[in-house]
Amino acid sequence: MATEAALAVEDRLHRLLRHLGVDQAHFAGWLAQDWSGLVTKCPQVVSSLILVNTFDRRFVEPVSGKLLVITGDRGPAAEKVRNAMRGVPGVQHVELSDYDIFPWSVIAGERTREFTDAMLEFLSRFTAPGSANSVPLPEGEGKVAGISYRIRGVGPPLVLLPLFLTPSQWEPLIPALSERYCTITLGGAALGAVAILEARGHAIGYLEMVRNLIEKADLRSGEAVLEVGCGSGVLARWLARRTAGGNRITGVDINPYLLREAKTLARQEGLETAIEFRDGNAEALPFADNSFEVVMSVTVIEETDADQMLAEMVLVTKPGGRVAVIARALDIGSPKNLPLSAGFKAKIEAPGFTGDVSSRGCADASLYRRVQQAGLTQVKMLPQLAAFDQADPTVLQFLEGALLPKLNEEEVREWQTARAEAEAMGIFYMTWPHHCAVGTKP
């Protein structure tokens, strides 16, 4: 029998459903890594599926005719979904008007009524025999197979998988949904953005980049460290172990969902006293001026007002302290090691082929200019590639999930054949380009 740590997501979900006595349920989610295994391997438990801002034609055939996709009506994500859905039968598509959805958008809070109405109208179609039946589950919380759950309401079970990086997650929708359905909201380190952040933060190729950043920041024993946008806390925990308690470490994030998971994971690893997690906005940090010797941030500046965030980071850094920032790089190509035709390889390795950046965010070499304009000196500029191989399946699945929906069927087949060949030879990897900068506050 597989250990819990080795369980696939679909096996974890199946154990959870058995524990709750649920044979069949409606599901709603975002990331394919959360729902694809269940849909393809255990389709009999899926009464219907609602996807938010995503579509992957590789996995949806088992739910044809009972699939709803909700997107905005503008922006690259909506266009990618439209292209991926083209020619696929049995899919209902609802577009939220005048809306561009990013991974960090507060979709359930900003479009509560439209989002709720779309879900309820779709779910109302599945009340005939054979759909998910009402289950008398008591309201409460628990954890099974590494997945946390919270139950609200009475009715047919509706399993709510994490909404990527959305701060509010499903909370604004729960009151209305739980009037008609037994909502089962899921979390934990095995699902959603937390699973990706944790896997990425343990990958050798990624940690080498972060380790290089810390070394260039010249962190010394006794210095106070702030991580802005700490997410699940995976890097804060890594730093706490690396420094063995020699530094006061604080993590701040605006996302309550990620902060809850960060505190839980730190407690599970016995690091709850080594790291302080705080709620706070990167554009208005809740700390006094000159509070930390080192202020760092990793792949957050793409999602904020970049210049305002840098100004805040400098403000809370002590004179002589260092500010260290990593941004995803949409202006650098991303090499992939597998035998593809030259034209196809050039297409998918081109700068900016995948990735997101907000209107005021920074995901290019302007990071170095911005850091200097923020008043930092002795700026070190470190463009780097983080590589992920077969030892990093969760990150590879995420990167592949961003790539494949932008390809046509012939290209997908070529990719899958080439990947299988490269994996058989043990040479497959994908890369994620970044810009890294370290500067000193005068």
Q: Across the structure, where does each feature detected by a protein language model lie?
A:
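A short glycine-rich, Lys/Arg-flanked "PGG" loop and its adjoining helix->strand segment in the class I
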Residues: D307-R322
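A short acidic, Gly/Pro-enriched loop at the edge of an enzyme's catalytic core
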Residues: E283-V294
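Conserved catalytic/acceptor-binding region of the Class I
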Residues: R322-A391
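Catalytic active-site module of serine/aspartate enzymes centered on a nucleophile-bearing elbow/loop
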Residues: E95-P138
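Conserved alpha-helix/loop element of class I SAM-dependent methyltransferases that forms part
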Residues: G205-E223, W238
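Conserved Class I S-adenosyl-L-methionine
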Residues: A365, Q378-P442
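Conserved HGGG/HGGXW glycine-rich cap/lid loop of the alpha/beta-hydrolase fold
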Residues: I151-G192, G205, L239, E303
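Class I SAM-dependent methyltransferase SAM/SAH-binding core
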Residues: A224-L226, S232-A284
